[in-house]
Amino acid sequence: MMRPKPVKKRSKKTPMIALAAAIALSVPAVAAPIPQASAQHLVQTQTYAIDGTRVDLPTINIDGTTYIGLRSLNTSLGLNTNYSPINREVHVEGNNRTMTIDLSEPVSAYFFNDQRVYGMSAIVQDGTTYMPVRFLLERMGYGISYDAAAKTVGITQIQENDLTIETHKIESGEGEPHVLVHYPQVSGYADEEAQASVNAFLKEQAEQRAAAGAEEIARAQSENDAAEADNPDLTIPPVSFDGTYLVTYNEQDKLSLYVDYYSYTGGAHGITDRAAYTFDLTTGEQLSLQDAANGRADYVEVINDSIQRQLDAGAYHFMEPFESIDTADQNFFLKHDAIVVYFGVYEYTAYAEGIPEFPVPFTAFE
């Protein structure tokens, strides 16, 4: 039977949510991002290698993030994009996925797998919508790379497991404090027993988290109501508890994902707790970090060395020296080409740096 990992805490401070940002490609920057472009951004021709075929596409590069014109995705990747002028919404469909971008808000709202997700805002310029390429395409089932020597962005369609991911949700009743937890359920996989085991575990985890979150915000709402009653000039925003998942790896009979649970109980901002799970779909069991690292006996040293190199290169500013990952219970998830080790906000970093993530390529464990 699978058991959830205990939540780790390095300090007494609890992790707080940071605004999600698209992972940057190593392309020169030209300006600061402006969602609905009030100033013209430089549109450049960028060479892409799409499943081995080279093509030049319109691109905007801002502060290390590459934005791609959505219109070019219709012919180049076979994705279907359309724009609804009435709702000011862009719809991107392909690989059994749909993403909706709501351009009516000052900062673009993204909806994926029936969930609202957060990322760098889209740019609208000269009638064309530009999206952060990595943020968009990794969610649509593509691997992204960058060849600095050739100055070429690589896009490869990922050969995924033959299954379907469905979004289920747990929602509070009318008149109750806001609870909305999304969680994935797998269907169509060949091994139905393993699939049922994974689904039961994910459902149980979501139910437990939703119940605990509901209790937490109910207590907070009661305290907030009392505080407002004592001070008529005080207004505290409504409390809430949300869970949003992202499948990060669906290959080679493995499934990896994380759920970000966000709790707002009043104050300047809320708290996020990330729970990651990696499954062997042939057994329905969770994989350990060492399992994911190809069983390497020295996996801790390999990961520590990679993290330290990334820190030396300025990836994050740790508030205390990094010594080693937690050998007993280190948080991680998989992506197309790497194991991603992560730490909670305030575990090593200040709030503004969000959840520190350190990708370690699979090739490091060969």
Language-model segment annotations:
Residues 2-38:
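Sec-dependent N-terminal signal peptides of Gram-positive bacterial secreted proteins and lipoproteins
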Residues 14, 18-22, 45, 98, ...:
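N-terminal functional modules and adjacent low-complexity/disordered segments of proteins
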Residues 92-96:
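Active-site beta-strand termini and strand-to-loop segments that position acidic
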Residues 97-104:
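Glycan-recognition/cleft segments
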